[in-house]
Amino acid sequence: MGTSSCGDHEKQRIEDEEQYGVLLYYKYTSVPDLDELVSFYESSCNSLGLLGRVRLSPKGVNVTVGGKLTALEEHIAAAKSNCLFEGTDFKLASCHHPLNDKVAEECGFTSLSIRVVEELVTFSPCPPLKPPEISNAGKHLSAAEFHSVLQSANGKSENKELVLLDARNLYETRIGKFESENVETLDPEIRQYSDLPTWIDQNAEKMKGKNVLMYCTGGIRCEMASAYIRSKGAGFENTFQLYGGIQRYLEQFPSGGFFKGKNFVFDHRISVGSSKEDIIGSCLLCNNTFDDYSPRCRCRLCRMLVLVCNHCRVKGDIYICELCRKHGKGEVPLSLDPLNQPSESNGDNTRRKLRILCLHGFRQNASSFKGRTGSLAKKLKNIAELVFIDAPHELQFIYQTATPPSGVCNKKFAWLVSSDFDKPSETGWTVAQCQFDPLQYQTQTEGFDKSLTYLKTAFEEKGPFDGILGFSQGAAMAAAVCGKQEQLVGEIDFRFCVLCSGFTPWPLLEMKEKRSIKCPSLHIFGSQPGKDRQIVTQASSDLAGLFEDGCATIVEHDFGHIIPTKSPYIDEIKAFLYQFI
């Protein structure tokens, strides 16, 4: 009986594994009621136990979720009952349960994330680029048609030249791509999809007057990219895309066909290969054949995934990807004298600047903070690009004078608010009921969850970022994110923080005196009590005390509620930042 029972349990375990799957689909369409669509996904995915990512915008949906196959099939049936999803290609694949918790967490498959975004995939670079009209996207070719075109090109010369264009990132193309004799394959070797428009602009002549066959993982990236190519006009009309992406092609041609290697996927499977299981990837260090990303090794500088084989991989080692090496960053010493830096504008040796997300203080906005930090930005121009965003909580316009100020009200925002927070009135200015309290920051204990969700979207749409800089309440918000950094892997990734005139936010109060935050941090605040009339010196000092010994660098100045840009303070700021270049 015992043996039979064990056998039954094992059989059930295998059946459970066989019942698991991953579902991918997208649809570009006008969404008449976004709130209703959000409610549909919240209800359907939660009731069916689906985990993964759902991205919604006024222009459509992009979904990658996992769960029991029966649950996924039920979700598909529910979606198909809505005319919004007419013609949608639901790509459902059976697979094993997530076996590696770290990989599942990084891929977002340990929770359900439903977000409303501006772009289903972030095609726009910084500064923002107007997205091309999706109605102008390249013609869809089925897997069989795509294969036939490549097969014909192998046997005879076409009337027009044919090129293959891979719309994916470098870490994807390393382990798998289409290869065909007599057909040139263009690999942009980009870190992220938002770099593709610039590459297309710089390499347009390679595609002009030719038949361009585009492909990506599941098809969505080709929709926007092919429309962008076709928007260039005459000579770019013959741009085509593989419908259903590599996934549908491998389903049609299980042995791989013209696709060599493995298809990188953004879920716990990591990659999916053909029956041939050929390996085209290689170890970053020894160049031996290798294509397994499950160790999750990343470039120290840009955080892109890299391939490091089991023989070369040593815990604590630092890796520099081929792109950073190509642009000279891999030759930069880890410790530098900030006062004797070489020029950073020498052609191909130009190093990528650090990208730093800047969080303003309470009752400020991105524009005003950018203005206040103009001198800082100028002195860091060869080191860092500062990116400013408004906080999500809009505040009332408050005045204390006898009559309200005249002129247009510039919106003010906050990351954290008090429990009696009131949304702005439609009438404009509101008279203050009492004097402004210099200790009001101590009562700002609400709004963190909304701000955290907002930052996740900012990182997804405007990232990647190397670090976060926060001022006053913005520093408190940045510190709170640092405290949750391990829980936010894959959603909010950064390597350091700069906290100016900060204080301990309520999410970190329970950590007081524990020095448990391991994120490298630079703390800048006034050393003389009373000089900073907004945030007392001790509050900023206490915040620095939450960061682990060896992680926190402190710069104390003789001024008030500002970020100093004179020597020696600016030299100390540069010295900290140069560690990450």
Curated annotation (Swiss-Prot):
Designated name of the protein: Rhodanese-like domain-containing protein 6
Pfam family, one: UPF0176_N
Active-site residue numbers: 216
InterPro entries, per the entry: AB_hydrolase_fold (IPR029058), FSH-like_dom (IPR005645), Rhodanese-like_dom (IPR001763), Rhodanese-like_dom_sf (IPR036873), Rhodanese_C (IPR022111), TrhO (IPR020936), TRHO_N (IPR040503)
Annotated Rhodanese domain residues: 158-258
UniProt superkingdom: Eukaryota
Transmembrane segments: none
Source organism per UniProt: Arabidopsis thaliana (Mouse-ear cress)
CDD domains attached to this UniProt entry: RHOD_YceA (cd01518)
Coiled coil: none
Protein encoded by which gene: STR6
